[in-house]
From Swiss-Prot:
<feature type="cross-link" description="Isoglutamyl cysteine thioester (Cys-Gln)">
    <location>
        <begin position="975"/>
        <end position="978"/>
    </location>
</feature>
<feature type="glycosylation site" description="N-linked (GlcNAc...) asparagine">
    <location>
        <position position="1143"/>
    </location>
</feature>
<dbReference type="InterPro" id="IPR041555">
    <property type="entry name" value="MG3"/>
</dbReference>
<keyword id="KW-0722">Serine protease inhibitor</keyword>
<dbReference type="InterPro" id="IPR047565">
    <property type="entry name" value="Alpha-macroglob_thiol-ester_cl"/>
</dbReference>
<feature type="glycosylation site" description="N-linked (GlcNAc...) asparagine">
    <location>
        <position position="393"/>
    </location>
</feature>
<feature type="disulfide bond">
    <location>
        <begin position="468"/>
        <end position="563"/>
    </location>
</feature>
<dbReference type="InterPro" id="IPR002890">
    <property type="entry name" value="MG2"/>
</dbReference>
<dbReference type="InterPro" id="IPR019742">
    <property type="entry name" value="MacrogloblnA2_CS"/>
</dbReference>
<keyword id="KW-0646">Protease inhibitor</keyword>
<dbReference type="GO" id="GO:0004867">
    <property type="term" value="F:serine-type endopeptidase inhibitor activity"/>
</dbReference>
<dbReference type="Pfam" id="PF07677">
    <property type="entry name" value="A2M_recep"/>
</dbReference>
<dbReference type="InterPro" id="IPR041813">
    <property type="entry name" value="A2M_TED"/>
</dbReference>
<feature type="disulfide bond">
    <location>
        <begin position="643"/>
        <end position="678"/>
    </location>
</feature>
<comment type="function">
    <text>Protease inhibitor with a wide spectrum of protein targets, which attaches through its thioester function.</text>
</comment>
<feature type="glycosylation site" description="N-linked (GlcNAc...) asparagine">
    <location>
        <position position="55"/>
    </location>
</feature>
<feature type="disulfide bond">
    <location>
        <begin position="595"/>
        <end position="774"/>
    </location>
</feature>
Amino acid sequence: MKKDREAQLCLFSALLAFLPFASLLNGNSKYMVLVPSQLYTETPEKICLHLYHLNETVTVTASLISQRGTRKLFDELVVDKDLFHCVSFTIPRLPSSEEEESLDINIEGAKHKFSERRVVLVKNKESVVFVQTDKPMYKPGQSVKFRVVSMDKNLHPLNELFPLAYIEDPKMNRIMQWQDVKTENGLKQLSFSLSAEPIQGPYKIVILKQSGVKEEHSFTVMEFVLPRFGVDVKVPNAISVYDEIINVTACATYTYGKPVPGHVKISLCHGNPTFSSETKSGCKEEDSRLDNNGCSTQEVNITEFQLKENYLKMHQAFHVNATVTEEGTGSEFSGSGRIEVERTRNKFLFLKADSHFRHGIPFFVKVRLVDIKGDPIPNEQVLIKARDAGYTNATTTDQHGLAKFSIDTNGISDYSLNIKVYHKEESSCIHSSCTAERHAEAHHTAYAVYSLSKSYIYLDTEAGVLPCNQIHTVQAHFILKGQVLGVLQQIVFHYLVMAQGSILQTGNHTHQVEPGESQVQGNFALEIPVEFSMVPVAKMLIYTILPDGEVIADSVKFQVEKCLRNKVHLSFSPSQSLPASQTHMRVTASPQSLCGLRAVDQSVLLQKPEAELSPSLIYDLPGMQDSNFIASSNDPFEDEDYCLMYQPIAREKDVYRYVRETGLMAFTNLKIKLPTYCNTDYDMVPLAVPAVALDSSTDRGMYESLPVVAVKSPLPQEPPRKDPPPKDPVIETIRNYFPETWIWDLVTVNSSGVTELEMTVPDTITEWKAGALCLSNDTGLGLSSVASFQAFQPFFVELTMPYSVIRGEAFTLKATVLNYLPTSLPMAVLLEASPDFTAVPVENNQDSYCLGANGRHTSSWLVTPKSLGNVNFSVSAEARQSPGPCGSEVATVPETGRKDTVVKVLIVEPEGIKKEHTFSSLLCASDAELSETLSLLLPPTVVKDSARAHFSVMGDILSSAIKNTQNLIQMPYGCGEQNMVLFAPNIYVLKYLNETQQLTEKIKSKALGYLRAGYQRELNYKHKDGSYSAFGDHNGQGQGNTWLTAFVLKSFAQARAFIFIDESHITDAFTWLSKQQKDSGCFRSSGSLLNNAMKGGVDDEITLSAYITMALLESSLPDTDPVVSKALSCLESSWENIEQGGNGSFVYTKALMAYAFALAGNQEKRNEILKSLDKEAIKEDNSIHWERPQKPTKSEGYLYTPQASSAEVEMSAYVVLARLTAQPAPSPEDLALSMGTIKWLTKQQNSYGGFSSTQDTVVALDALSKYGAATFSKSQKTPSVTVQSSGSFSQKFQVDKSNRLLLQQVSLPYIPGNYTVSVSGEGCVYAQTTLRYNVPLEKQQPAFALKVQTVPLTCNNPKGQNSFQISLEISYMGSRPASNMVIADVKMLSGFIPLKPTVKKLERLGHVSRTEVTTNNVLLYLDQVTNQTLSFSFIIQQDIPVKNLQPAIVKVYDYYETDEVAFAEYSSPCSSDDQNV
């Protein structure tokens, strides 16, 4: 009753709504104007006019109305007879990317006028832009290469200008940017280098369009080792709840295609599809050995998981993981698979079943019956039941598993058609808890199409995906009813085809009608040309207008093949070759195409698979997506009144909805909408459901695009060569080039559409995946399929040896030869003799043997190095002809690749502790010769043969630093302050060489690269509040450091002149610093001061404030800035207090203040402080420097005067900077006094151009560069330098303009020995002698108490041979309350490596800020050390056995007071035992 009452109410509403139309549509003109709901600028659009039953001449106009005014789309159109006509128009580009405008349609005659205004969306046609990187994942320090591709919607190249392109790291820091990037022929290639320690995680490349739209591309940065092999897990896609066994196959294959020997562990876990730890209900594990094909198949019994019982409780699935452990190396890699659990053993897929039916037109159903694997099931009975139509039927599936039905819809009285398809028989299970076996069944519900006269048209299409450039035939079925048909002689059906939001095709079909018929039924075929412009989706609307004004229509969506007009092919000839050989690459494409080439090691893609660049990916780009626009207001058809809140009884589909789904809007006075105002939610129409799952899609084409069967087709094989290749001579392969990206290049194909390149194959034995992306002005984009190239040798040799040994130790060198040929090989293995080592074969006759097919063999030598330094080991494996058989086979050798040679370097180090002394002098000669003597002495305990020395000459004061800007100090760079020593000196070098006009492109490129890398690294240490600290924010728990933030601020501000620095980093740092300023103008300290020299002045606050003021002024802030002005007031007050308190204990603070006042232009205060400092200067040997009165005392017994400490170098350099910053220029007196300090500073330089630590290096190089620029002379002076011994050695160097920056060097032969250095001619030279040697570890009075033990202590435990624990105890015993930051450097025993996880755990301790692990040592960064003992321990394990193990050294030192150092040594618990080598 309720249903009938509601239906009557809706029908009554409909009748009322239609009363006004009755008089209008009897004899009056009928209009329908179809327009895309979304219009694009600068491209031809169409508006289609349909004027029917026209009884007067009318004028048609169309206008777009916006805030900028009214624009006519076309000239007035005068029509005097029935017409269907489409008019083209073009809209000019909008100032914004899109806007809603009003489209006004007017059709006006003498008697009648039709006018309607609707809202349309007008959009600028955006370019299609994407980014391609050379690979999806990068390691720290690698170069990221990428190309920007720009096309129009037709995929033709654009020369587009992008205002900005930039890189964002995981913290959204902009680390690199390019401005005004322009594509040429649609392509632009860019690159940038990652720092050695970047933030790891996802990065973004962002391309900003002129419209403001951003296109993004992601890549990953992380530390990783490329997988040598991949693991493929083969499992069924699905099983049924009735299955008891799952077959799991795991196969491991090297990247060069050969099977992996080893073991596999298979884990099968049951749970719901999320597989979180909470939803796993159980796992089973199986272990097995891989067979000769690298595979293992396991039958896993799954009855314990009770699938039938659990099916109703949760959606079940299995996750399978297989971990393969490679034999010999222990390397592990994994693969995984997933298995769905289904209720039945087979299921139905609906391939055809429309969402709506039409009374009087057959309803077509096509299903495919598939098994649990998705394979079709032929010759099986399929039954169908449609109770609403009184229809039942049965048929048998064909060879493709298909069953077809046609349901008569004449007898359907309801608004819905419910269909049930089942296999064999209907399920007897009524309740959901039934566990009896079920057969496949599926349900589908279709709803009626609305027509007042019960007239319909239906488009029937078979194809799933339409191929390009072909004719597609669409069958149209129609039935027309009603009295109005009696007056018709013919009826015309009109159709439109839409794609990419525009009307592409229109046409019509005329059907003749016999007079007096009350029902007309028939069908006809329409042929639709499939054009490229229709890719990827086309929509077709067909309609006709009946005499009474009723419109009947249907629409259909076509999936069009994602084809590209530019046919690109890439191939290699040959497609398999030896490493380092030549191969021929051929690319074909449309003539004059610009092609981007790429070839990547398959191992990279195994590590991180990426979406392959394909037509599907291109057509899925945002710029290629098409969407319908539905106005939010001003749509007369959308303004529906509310009705009663009940579930609608009808889900009928009307013409209005067909029009809207096609992407059109209709301006009309015809009947196109369902005559009811009841609130019907069309978007919730339920559709057919394959098996049990509910599918709510409304797309008819969905059934055609369902994946049915995944069939792997065999790859095409290369045709066999007709002629055998000629025999090559023995080609020896020496492999040392192992890139991850082999090819990344742009090439242009010639007028014939071909380009050919000769390529050198890298040395990696792997499979390379290559592809080409080409753009043509004529045919647009083209993509090649992936081409494979296999770099492979029939056999090759691998060496196993330690990273380094100490002289006197012995180790076993192993050479393993792997044969991947199906035949045995007579093999000869040779270790090249050398005077640098002795080698004894472990086995007799091991240099010649028969290597079996697909086998491996290891030859070993007991090696004892004799020389120090880098020792080369060269091992060759050669397949040689043999007259006799090889095993049971005839001896054969390969045609190519018969010899493989591998060269590896071993570092042989002397015993004891390394010592280095540097003797530097700035020598300036005039007319007379200038000379000085130098005695190179050695302590009596020097390690034999460890002494070496060299003499260097440079014509420029910064030559050494310029050459070694990334190695200025031989110390770790693991914190935010130390990183800046890699950054700031490059600024001073660039400024200096620029000012002196000595800057070359090579030096500039190198310095800019270092600046960019340092900039990236420093952002690792930034906090969210804009500050910086030594080790970053530690997940938000760390505190920003005031001093370091000021240092970074000034460095970034100065670097802006050379590289991109995101201004926000400078602003953030300044804002944070300003918040640390007190009312007095001084700055409060935040975070720990790693360098205690900052505490050596009046107090922390004044010294710190002087440093920050200096940093702000060096950042180009004026002294009138409020923050700077207040800071200077703080310094002025502090200086007055220092003056009143007397001199003597504030040297460091005064040096900083003098420079700060000089920068501020306060010459008076600068001069006062310099005068005070002059009284405290230490003047000796024609040099001037300053020292702290309370500096740490140095140990006695030094053979040479030790290098000055960091603080002394800093303060002396600050005095130089203060003198050279005099306004308007330094006086001759300033330069003369500075010269004395510069002489002292140069004597403190180390052999790399740096000083003892980081801050002194930065400040001193700043002072040296400014002094060098102030005194630089372009005169043609050519001094010569001679170094000679007291014996026969003599070497002369000439210094002139051409080699001024060149570092000239010679080794000194006599140590110990006396040498004389003489300079003649005119000019200054920088001379430096470096002496290095080793001494045994001796007992001393160190600044640190250091105790090192091993656990176990002795070799009682057999495990002590392979791994043991190192335990350290450290405390400070120096003259200060606490040290600065301390480094503990633990060197590894030869053949041992640290267990990284046990080292990284130490970072959880409060006093360990950072750890660094390499093959040869472990570094621990300690904030500071007091007299309280700190304890640490970690585990090391044996990698390569070594005999006669020597002790390893542990060094603990103050980072800023490097003379405060302690040494200890440790040995393996079993070092006294005979090792198995």
